[in-house]
Design a protein with these regions (language model features):
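Flexible "cap/lid" loop of the alpha/beta hydrolase fold
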Residues: 140-174
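Conserved hydrolase catalytic core segment
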Residues: 112-154
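Bacterial Sec-dependent N-terminal signal peptides
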Residues: 1-22, 241
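Active-site loop/oxyanion-hole signature of alpha/beta-hydrolase fold enzymes
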Residues: 77-121
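Alpha/beta-hydrolase
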Residues: 173-231, 238
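Short beta-strand/loop motif that positions the catalytic acidic residue
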Residues: 236, 242-243
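Conserved HGGG/HGGXW glycine-rich cap/lid loop of the alpha/beta-hydrolase fold
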Residues: 27-85
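Active-site acidic short loop of glycosyltransferases
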Residues: 40-42, 68, 107-112, 135, ...
């Protein structure tokens, strides 16, 4: 009986160490920002998802691997996941609001310098945070990130188009004709492996790219601040890893 109890206690402790935790804080403008925590050992890393506007759970494969050796914080950026906005407009999606959110997370985690792991837009947001709050970052890790300025958009589209097949282009035109978002059509162009692209496409919600969605509003403001960001980034002296 004692052995059974010990086994049960061990399993219970193991589950609690590896289970998901959900918490939140209120940002400067009163928006409640949620985050999830996976794993409990090792260094703390903050995962910043792409979009802007994608539900962060598409990074599940990544944090399920990392949680074995790290404490992973999955931030639900404003307007995504559980971090709902009362109003989605240009004011609520300014880059400075995202920076306020990361400052709130920084305080919530005890004021320890952050290790930011940014995918796509998440990397672009990491640049913005480093430009404005360089002393609060320990390290930046970029996963298929966009650039520091909006100049990368000029070749970004070409890289996507060269991977598209006739069937993708047909769907692209159909989406335009039906006034639907085109990302569902060009999604395979973001991947080296088409099979993986097609496998990940169905669960995604592409409404975030609609005219009044998170994507055009947040990325639009980010593009406006390119010169300012480049100038301020000179103050960040920490390491940046590119993957």
């Amino acid at each position: 009986m004692k052995n059974i109890f010990q086994i049960f206690l061990f399993l219970l402790i193991s589950y609690s160490l590896n289970s998901q935790k959900i918490d939140s804080f209120f940002s400067k403008d009163g928006t409640e920002i949620f985050y999830e925590e996976f794993g409990s050992k090792g260094k703390t890393i903050v995962l910043l998802s792409g979009g802007p506007g994608l539900n962060p759970h598409y990074l599940e494969t990544l944090y399920n691997q990392l949680k074995q050796n790290y404490r992973c914080i999955l931030l639900h950026q404003r307007g995504t996941g559980k971090s709902l906005l009362k109003t989605i407009n240009q004011e609520s999606l300014l880059v400075e609001k995202y920076i306020d959110d990361l400052n709130g997370l920084y305080k919530k985690l005890g004021g320890e310098k952050l290790i930011l792991v940014g995918h796509s837009w998440g990397g672009m947001l990491s640049f913005s945070y480093a430009a404005n709050e360089p002393e609060k970052i320990k390290k930046i890790i970029l996963l298929n990130s966009g650039g520091v300025t909006d100049k990368f958009y000029s070749w970004f589209g070409s890289n996507i188009n060269m991977r598209l097949l006739p069937e993708d282009n047909k769907l692209y035109q159909e989406q335009i004709d039906n006034k639907q978002d085109v990302l569902v059509a060009i999604w395979p162009g973001y991947f080296f492996d088409r099979k993986i692209a097609l496998k990940t496409r169905p669960p995604l919600d592409f409404k975030f790219r609609n005219q009044d969605g998170v994507n055009p509003l947040a990325s639009g403001d980010w593009r406006k601040k390119s010169d300012e960001r480049v100038s301020k980034l000179k103050n960040y002296n920490g390491p940046i890893d590119l993957i």
